[in-house]
């Protein structure tokens, strides 16, 4: 399996949301996660992010979906990129306020740096969290 194929499998598992159990075979243990987004400030590993997504997509906004618009892979930097829109409605517990019934359609980008074993060794998420939080009625 190629690095890009594994990156795609990780992306799909993370967004489905399969949680860490569904993602860990594609990720190096302890792989760092970064995002300059308010809700994710304390999330520092890919494992923690996968679990955060699973909680959001099964408890806070069950049934959330995504549309993948484009993806690519840079062989020189071993980096996969995925640009998508996340669709979610706040119908469950777990947000900063009781369920609002409001929805978001929020763009985001993942950058996944792969190692020589074709596993994710670092993840960066670019996401305008305030946009999503406003749409969900959280701000």
Identify the function of each model-found stretch.
Residues 1-139:
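C-terminal and inter-domain tail/linker signature
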């Amino acid at each position: 399996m190629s690095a890009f194929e594994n990156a795609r499998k990780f992306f799909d598992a993370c967004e489905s949301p399969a949680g860490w159990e569904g993602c860990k075979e594609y990720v190096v243990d302890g792989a760092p996660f970064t995002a300059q987004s308010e809700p994710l400030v304390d999330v520092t590993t890919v494992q923690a992010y996968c679990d955060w997504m699973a909680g959001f997509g099964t408890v806070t906004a069950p049934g959330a979906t995504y549309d993948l618009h484009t993806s690519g892979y840079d062989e020189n930097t071993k980096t996969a990129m995925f640009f998508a829109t996340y669709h979610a409605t706040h119908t469950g517990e777990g947000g900063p306020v009781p369920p609002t019934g409001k929805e978001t359609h929020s763009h985001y980008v993942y950058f996944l740096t792969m190692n020589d074993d074709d596993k994710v060794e670092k993840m960066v998420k670019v996401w305008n969290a305030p946009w999503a939080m406003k749409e969900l009625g959280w701000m």
